[in-house]
Structure formats: C-alpha cells, structure tokens
C-alpha cells in the first residue's frame, strides 16, 4: 500500500489580464487543496511586502478637513486619491516625493516628481482637478511595509511626527488586491479522489501574481520550518511572554468591507468600528441589533467568508493599545 503523499506535478499559470492570473496546481491528496489554498490566500492578503504613502504635507492645509481654493476635491478626497497611487521603491525603504502643479487641468500620479529609485506603477491615476488659478504643492512620504497599518496605531520615535500640517495616513502596503481559490476534482491513473487547486490572483502591479504566490509559499515554508526542526533556543518555561500578533486585516475599519449603507450604519450604532470588533460577535448578537435583519446578516457573513473570516471568533488582547474608536 502506498503511504507517501502525492506532490503537485502540474503548475500552470494563465494570464487573465494585466496583473491578473489564474494559477492551477495538481494533483493533491484529498483535503490538501483546501488546506493549502486557504493558507496561501491568508498569507497573500496579509503578509506581502509592498509600498504605500504614509504621511502627506499639503501647502496651506493644517488638517484633513480643510479645503483648497482652486482644487475641486476637498482634502479628504485628495488624500483618498493619493492613497490610490501605487509606488515601487528600488533598494530603499522610504522616500519623500513632491507633487507640484498649478493652472487649470487634471493632476495625475504621473505629475509626481520622483527620485531615480522610485517608480509609479499607475501614472494615469487621477489625484485632483485644478480650476483656473488653482495650485497644488504636496510632499508625500512613501514607506516599505507589510499588510495594513492604520495611522492611529503607528508609532514614531521623534517629535517631528507632531509637526502641524503633517497628515498621517492609513497605509495599505499589500501589493495583492484580490485572491480567491477553488478546489476541483483531479485524476491520476485510476485514482479519482484527488484535488486540483485553482487560485485567482490580482495584484497592484508592484509584483506579478506568479511572484506573489512564490513569496507566499516561501513565507509558509519559513514559518513551518520551525516545527520541522523541533529545535529552539528557549524552552516553554524560559521563553518570555509575548503578546499575540494581530492579523492586520482585523485592524481595518468595517467600511473597508463595502457593506450596504444600512448594514454599515447598524454596526456603527452598536460600536462595531473595526473588522476585529465584528468577527467577535455571534449571529444571535447581531440579529438583536435594531434594523439589522437576516438579509443584512447574510451579507455580512458572505463578505467575511470572502476574506477567510467568520462570526463568533475569539481574539486575545483586543482591542490593541492605541486603537481609536
């Protein structure tokens, strides 16, 4: 009787468009498609290294609720548009770039003055619209990071972070935009009870879908290698206690789930502001929320499931220190 496990012999990559691909891997033993597919998906969404604007200083602006003469967008929308610019740094971890433009017209990411080791992936991305006499002068700090880091939980080591007019942004570093997977049936000779893993990956263009799945696989191998070696420098008794790491996805506001206005308002009325708050609630608790019915509950469950989450989960040390409500 064969006791060794099958390893995938076929890995095919099919391009579905720019920065979008389908990766097919087969065969797997039954059950391994879901085991590996879910693990890869979680790593792809939460652990990929990327680049994002983290701080912005706009001439003539003290805080994000200001407006600028001659600029169609208010500062809040201007910041949202700046967060949509996809940067890529080469051989450095941070850089400050400048955006200066005046006169009537459209301001795009291609108007940003870049250093030689900084690149904009989407130069046609619209940032603002200037009317006659309008002027925009912006300093943008771009940093390398991982996952999603809300501005209100970031830590700084010097007083310069408190400069009036400097606006700290929520930073979504992940270069992976969307990931989904399905498990289909596969066959090898007479065996028909095998799995075929099909992953659908879309990135921002900083890395290709193929490179994204390679990096996620390396991360998993690196993490699991500790268990394979069963060697450590600390015993359980000697190891200092460490606070559990919180998945960056849980620090995102519930607005990022893109729920209907009705569902989102019901959650906020119950002081559910972050995804980490939401997943700790049970179905029965949510159904007791005024104006939140079964239809809204099903919508919430479907959106959470698309991110590998469910209701009724337990979190340690929640909320983390510094998380605003």
Curated annotation (Swiss-Prot):
Asked if the keyword Transcription belongs to this entry, the reply reads yes
**Region called Alpha N-terminal domain (alpha-NTD), residue ranges:** 1-231
Matching SMART domains, A to Z? RPOLD
The GO terms describing molecular function are:
DNA binding; DNA-directed RNA polymerase activity; protein dimerization activity
Family annotation (CDD domains): RNAP_alpha_NTD
Coiled coil location: none
Q: Name one GO cellular component term.
A: DNA-directed RNA polymerase complex
Task: From the UniProt entry, list the residue stretches annotated as the region Alpha C-terminal domain (alpha-CTD).
Answer: 246-325
* Stored Gene3D superfamilies: 5' to 3' exonuclease, C-terminal subdomain, DNA-directed RNA polymerase, insert domain, RNA polymerase, RBP11-like subunit
Record has Transferase as a keyword: yes
Q: Which GO terms describe its biological process?
A: DNA-templated transcription
**EC number per UniProt:** 2.7.7.6
Reactions that this protein is recorded to catalyse:
RNA(n) + a ribonucleoside 5'-triphosphate = RNA(n+1) + diphosphate
SUPFAM superfamilies of this UniProt entry? C-terminal domain of RNA polymerase alpha subunit (SSF47789), Insert subdomain of RNA polymerase alpha subunit (SSF56553), RBP11-like subunits of RNA polymerase (SSF55257)
* UniProt keyword annotations, A-Z: DNA-directed RNA polymerase, Nucleotidyltransferase, Transcription, Transferase
**Matching InterPro entries, A to Z?**
DNA-dir_RNA_pol_insert, DNA-dir_RNA_pol_RpoA/D/Rpb3, DNA-dir_RpoA, RBP11-like, RNAP_asu_C, RNApol_insert_sf
Q: How does it assemble?
A: Homodimer. The RNAP catalytic core consists of 2 alpha, 1 beta, 1 beta' and 1 omega subunit. When a sigma factor is associated with the core the holoenzyme is formed, which can initiate transcription.
Q: Main role?
A: DNA-dependent RNA polymerase catalyzes the transcription of DNA into RNA using the four ribonucleoside triphosphates as substrates.
Q: What is known of its domains?
A: The N-terminal domain is essential for RNAP assembly and basal transcription, whereas the C-terminal domain is involved in interaction with transcriptional regulators and with upstream promoter elements.
NCBIfam families reported in the protein's UniProt record: PRK05182.1-2, PRK05182.2-5, rpoA
| Protein name, per record | DNA-directed RNA polymerase subunit alpha
State the organism of origin: Burkholderia mallei (strain ATCC 23344)
Q: Which gene encodes it?
A: rpoA
């Amino acid at each position: 009787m064969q006791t060794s496990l099958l390893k995938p012999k076929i890995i095919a990559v099919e391009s579905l468009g720019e920065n979008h691909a389908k990766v097919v891997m087969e065969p797997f033993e039954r059950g391994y498609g879901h085991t590996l597919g879910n693990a890869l998906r979680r790593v792809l969404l939460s652990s990929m290294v990327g680049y994002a604007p983290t701080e912005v200083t706009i001439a003539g602006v003290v805080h994000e609720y200001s407006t600028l003469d001659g600029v169609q967008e208010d500062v809040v929308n201007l910041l949202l548009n700046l967060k949509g610019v996809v940067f890529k740094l080469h051989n450095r971890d941070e850089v400050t770039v400048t955006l200066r433009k005046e006169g009537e017209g459209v301001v795009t990411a291609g108007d940003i003055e870049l250093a030689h080791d900084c690149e904009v992936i989407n130069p046609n991305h619209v940032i603002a619209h200037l009317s006659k006499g309008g002027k925009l002068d912006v300093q943008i700090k771009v940093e390398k990071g991982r996952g999603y880091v809300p501005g209100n939980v970031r830590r700084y080591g010097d007083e310069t972070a408190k400069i009036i007019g400097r606006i700290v942004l929520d930073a979504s570093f992940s270069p992976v935009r969307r990931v989904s997977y399905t498990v289909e049936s596969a066959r090898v000779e007479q065996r028909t009870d095998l799995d075929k893993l099909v992953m659908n990956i879309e990135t921002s263009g900083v890395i290709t879908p193929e490179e994204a799945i390679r990096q996620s696989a390396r991360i998993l191998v690196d993490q699991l290698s500790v268990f394979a070696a069963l060697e450590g420098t600390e015993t359980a008794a000697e190891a200092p206690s460490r606070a559990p790491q919180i998945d960056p996805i849980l620090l995102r506001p519930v607005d990022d789930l893109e729920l209907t206005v009705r569902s989102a308002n019901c959650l906020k009325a119950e002081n559910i502001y972050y995804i980490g708050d939401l997943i700790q609630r049970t179905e029965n608790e949510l159904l007791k929320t005024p104006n939140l019915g079964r239809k809204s509950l099903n919508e919430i469950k479907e959106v959470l499931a698309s991110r590998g989450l469910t209701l009724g989960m337990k979190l340690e040390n929640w909320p983390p220190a510094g998380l605003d409500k």
